[in-house]
Amino acid sequence: MTRETERFPAREFQRDLLDWFARERRDLPWRKDRDPYKVWVSEVMLQQTRVETVIPYFEQFIDRFPTLEALADADEDEVLKAWEGLGYYSRVRNLHAAVKEVKTRYGGKVPDDPDEFSRLKGVGPYTVGAVLSLAYGVPEPAVDGNVMRVLSRLFLVTDDIAKPSTRKRFEQIVREIMAYENPGAFNEALIELGALVCTPRRPSCLLCPVQAYCQAFAEGVAEELPVKMKKTAVKQVPLAVAVLADDEGRVLIRKRDSTGLLANLWEFPSCETDGADGKEKLEQMVGEQYGLQVELTEPIVSFEHAFSHLVWQLTVFPGRLVHGGPVEEPYRLAPEDELKAYAFPVSHQRVWREYKEWASGVRRPD
């Protein structure tokens, strides 16, 4: 028993939280079916992505891969295309690898043992708790950002939530206050409370069903919690991007490396500029590395795309392929009407939209 929960009225708290959840729970597509595979897909999608964004992607993904076996048997390019636009592509690569292992090692049944499930690729403590409690009723804690915020306020925890030790502390608290007869609903209710009521800014304390148990509310410091140390400044990376078409209307694209950021996704040719002339560097790169002669116009647009650890500063140059040798991997000349079949990261989807607007005369370079 931790000092936080030693005198905590857990049964009364469970009752008030679960009664509220029964009344107020959102009608979400992944809540209609407790199939372990579908729960797993939804939890992976919901990592670092808003619920409203996930809903249509989840429905389309399940339509395309309705069973674990269907996803396990799918080609990686097809899976990446189905995920296109959600970002954080390592999530779906790990999921794809993990369901393949489930199919071969466990006969297609998601393991209900926490140790076995946690050994699958990409499955961390939160995913273990969420999937196993919701699908199998296993009493494992599911501690995400919402839950850490709720618990920080409930128990007046001032430790930095970015530290692994703080997460472990919260996991232990959940184990001690959990409704063991219905762990899935309890975990889901805590998450829902953080999403709808105990929000990061301007929490609705007066409407909170568990306000009576909240130490931060009693002390008037709810908005000061949780404590999270600021990250260091992210790296800024200037990129020049070329949209190049040949005389037959085919567009030059390339496949990214099989490891690292945005692995195996397609993109338009690009290079880091480091403050140099982007047009000159692009022409030099394409010419020297791939033996292709290109003619670029002036840039049509510049914009930023942020990742968790860096920011791309993209400048887009339209142009044409004049002549050169055959196009070899990782490059490909794709007919324009076939580009939609390739999985592009969000940043390069925007590159294409900006290019099409420019080409149609909707906008001109500044």
Swiss-Prot record:
Keywords: 4Fe-4S, DNA damage, DNA repair, DNA-binding, Glycosidase, Hydrolase, Iron, Iron-sulfur, Metal-binding. Its cofactor is [4Fe-4S] cluster. [4Fe-4S] cluster binds at C198, C205, C208, C214. Its EC number is 3.2.2.31. The lineage of its organism: Bacteria, Bacillati, Bacillota, Bacilli, Bacillales. Belongs to the Nth/MutY family. It is an enzyme of class 3 (hydrolase). Residues 105-133 form the HhH domain. It catalyses: Hydrolyzes free adenine bases from 7,8-dihydro-8-oxoguanine:adenine mismatched double-stranded DNA, leaving an apurinic site. GO terms for biological process: base-excision repair; mismatch repair. This is Adenine DNA glycosylase. Binds 1 [4Fe-4S] cluster. The cluster has a structural role. Pfam families: EndIII_4Fe-2S, HHH, HhH-GPD, NUDIX_4. DNA binds at W30, R31, Q48, T49, L86, G87, Y88, Y126, E188, S308. The record marks D144 as: Transition state stabilizer. One of its GO terms (molecular function) is DNA binding. Base excision repair (BER) glycosylase that initiates repair of A:oxoG to C:G by removing the inappropriately paired adenine base from the DNA backbone, generating an abasic site product. 8-oxoguanine (oxoG) is a genotoxic DNA lesion resulting from oxidation of guanine; this residue is misread by replicative DNA polymerases, that insert adenine instead of cytosine opposite the oxidized damaged base. Shows a powerful dicrimination of A versus C, since it does not cleave cytosine in oxoG:C pairs. NCBIfam families: mutY. It comes from Geobacillus stearothermophilus. It comes from the Bacteria. The active site is at E43 (proton donor/acceptor).
